[in-house]
């Protein structure tokens, strides 16, 4: 697989993707309106953001009882985003088993041009047919190895090779839990760069659950990553993603070219993205527990809901989810954990953590 047909301006050192309208969907409980999406896409496009991701938080087909229903159908939002953007490319996420091949085709028909396919970091093989279809359709392809903190660099590189051989043009180290710390990112990105060579680029997607989203992204770039994700105003799951406006400020200072104007992206974050957020993404106890315990960031809202439903502490739910090594798609097990803690409370046996 060649990287020559990847959308990449030669003046860039890295290509930025803003995922406010996908990862941010978790924080907003998938309640984006067309007006919000149109305004955010226009502001990001004006600032020079080259790629904007738009989908339900859990990807194509994610609007469901298990993950939460979308206020506006995601395909309508993809179409609106593609019609609004003048320069930026519109990306969409899909998880095999949640989205389908038909969803990919519909997203392309609606103007999406970059297909990002996500699997758990040990299950790259389930993405093979989807990458094949995406390349047949002429879509650019990106692979997400989620929860990358859970396996060592050499095993992650083996999974990246599966994606690249299937047609993936850039494989991401995805720190879904915000649990990786500096050298953990560097070692994983370097392992993927060494394995993939010129066959595919390497990317990094970070979360702020330990406050390291920006620093980890810098480590990724220094280790050879060519694509970096972030969200304006940290608009994402958990404590949010690495804030794009901060990333651009830091990259400007260390000489990493992105093509994004710092002042324009700061304006977009403050004046357009922030008003669309239900609240700021906080580095609070719940978020810290997720980073510390290695919990998938989108579990936060689900844990809060079960906490309120069963009268048990959300941070205890999240800590036990980490102990059980739950992954994306197992959100329903938070109910079992809540009932377990409730029984312990009733018997007076609940531990402090």
UniProtKB/Swiss-Prot annotation:
<feature type="binding site">
    <location>
        <position position="296"/>
    </location>
    <ligand>
        <name>substrate</name>
    </ligand>
</feature>
<dbReference type="Pfam" id="PF00682">
    <property type="entry name" value="HMGL-like"/>
</dbReference>
<keyword id="KW-0058">Aromatic hydrocarbons catabolism</keyword>
<feature type="binding site">
    <location>
        <position position="205"/>
    </location>
    <ligand>
        <name>Mn(2+)</name>
    </ligand>
</feature>
<feature type="binding site">
    <location>
        <position position="205"/>
    </location>
    <ligand>
        <name>substrate</name>
    </ligand>
</feature>
<dbReference type="InterPro" id="IPR050073">
    <property type="entry name" value="2-IPM_HCS-like"/>
</dbReference>
<comment type="similarity">
    <text>Belongs to the 4-hydroxy-2-oxovalerate aldolase family.</text>
</comment>
<keyword id="KW-0464">Manganese</keyword>
<feature type="domain" description="Pyruvate carboxyltransferase">
    <location>
        <begin position="14"/>
        <end position="266"/>
    </location>
</feature>
<dbReference type="InterPro" id="IPR017629">
    <property type="entry name" value="4OH_2_O-val_aldolase"/>
</dbReference>
<dbReference type="InterPro" id="IPR035685">
    <property type="entry name" value="DRE_TIM_HOA"/>
</dbReference>
<dbReference type="InterPro" id="IPR000891">
    <property type="entry name" value="PYR_CT"/>
</dbReference>
<feature type="binding site">
    <location>
        <position position="207"/>
    </location>
    <ligand>
        <name>Mn(2+)</name>
    </ligand>
</feature>
<dbReference type="GO" id="GO:0030145">
    <property type="term" value="F:manganese ion binding"/>
</dbReference>
<keyword id="KW-0479">Metal-binding</keyword>
<dbReference type="GO" id="GO:0003852">
    <property type="term" value="F:2-isopropylmalate synthase activity"/>
</dbReference>
<dbReference type="GO" id="GO:0009056">
    <property type="term" value="P:catabolic process"/>
</dbReference>
<dbReference type="InterPro" id="IPR012425">
    <property type="entry name" value="DmpG_comm"/>
</dbReference>
<dbReference type="InterPro" id="IPR013785">
    <property type="entry name" value="Aldolase_TIM"/>
</dbReference>
<protein>
    <recommendedName>
        <fullName>4-hydroxy-2-oxovalerate aldolase 2</fullName>
        <ecNumber>4.1.3.39</ecNumber>
    </recommendedName>
</protein>
<dbReference type="Pfam" id="PF07836">
    <property type="entry name" value="DmpG_comm"/>
</dbReference>
<feature type="binding site">
    <location>
        <position position="23"/>
    </location>
    <ligand>
        <name>Mn(2+)</name>
    </ligand>
</feature>
<feature type="active site" description="Proton acceptor">
    <location>
        <position position="26"/>
    </location>
</feature>
<keyword id="KW-0456">Lyase</keyword>
<feature type="binding site">
    <location>
        <position position="176"/>
    </location>
    <ligand>
        <name>substrate</name>
    </ligand>
</feature>
<feature type="site" description="Transition state stabilizer">
    <location>
        <position position="22"/>
    </location>
</feature>
<dbReference type="GO" id="GO:0009098">
    <property type="term" value="P:L-leucine biosynthetic process"/>
</dbReference>
<feature type="binding site">
    <location>
        <begin position="22"/>
        <end position="23"/>
    </location>
    <ligand>
        <name>substrate</name>
    </ligand>
</feature>
<dbReference type="GO" id="GO:0008701">
    <property type="term" value="F:4-hydroxy-2-oxovalerate aldolase activity"/>
</dbReference>
